[in-house]
UniProtKB/Swiss-Prot annotation:
PANTHER family: PROFILIN, PROFILIN-5. Its main location: cytoplasm. InterPro entries: PFN, PFN_euk, PFN_sf, Profilin_CS. It holds the Pfam family Profilin. GO terms for molecular function: actin monomer binding. Keywords: Actin-binding, Allergen, Cytoplasm, Cytoskeleton, Disulfide bond, Phosphoprotein. The variability of the residues taking part of IgE-binding epitopes might be responsible of the difference in cross-reactivity among olive pollen cultivars, and between distantly related pollen species, leading to a variable range of allergy reactions among atopic patients. It is found in: Cytoplasm, Cytoskeleton. Gene3D superfamilies: Dynein light chain 2a, cytoplasmic. The modification Phosphothreonine is found at residue 114. It comes from Olea europaea (Common olive). This is Profilin-4. A motif (Involved in PIP2 interaction) lies at residues 84-100. Disulfide bonds join 13-118.
Amino acid sequence: MSWQAYVDDHLMCDIEGHEDHRLTAAAIVGHDGSVWAQSATFPQFKPEEMNGIMTDFNEPGHLAPTGLHLGGTKYMVIQGEAGAVIRGKKGSGGITIKKTGQALVFGIYEEPVTPGQCNMVVEGLGDYLLEQGL
C-alpha cells in the first residue's frame, strides 16, 4: 500500500459510525521533515515548525510555553503522551500527532469531529505502523 493510500483510506476516511465526519487534513511526515504523503488540505509547514515538533517528542513539554505551530497556525498544547503523542487545540478544532519509529502521523480536525475521534484515527494508524516496524 502506498503512503498516499494510508492518508486517503485510513486518515481522511469517514469516521467509524459517523458518515460525513472526517478529518480536515492529514499527513505522514518522516522524522527529517520530508512529506511521505498528505491530503490536499494539509498546510505547508516551515522546517522550524517540524523541528519544534520533533524536539517536543524528544523533550516533552518543549512546546507548552510557546504552543505548537504548523503552517502558521498556533495550537495550544494539551495533554498528550510523552514521547509518543502530541495533541493541540485551537478554537473548535485541533491536531493530533503520533510518532512512530520512522514517521509522524498528523491529523487536523474541526467540529463536528471531536478530539477523541481524531485521536482514535491518528493513533490507530500510528499504532499499526509501529506494529509493522515503521
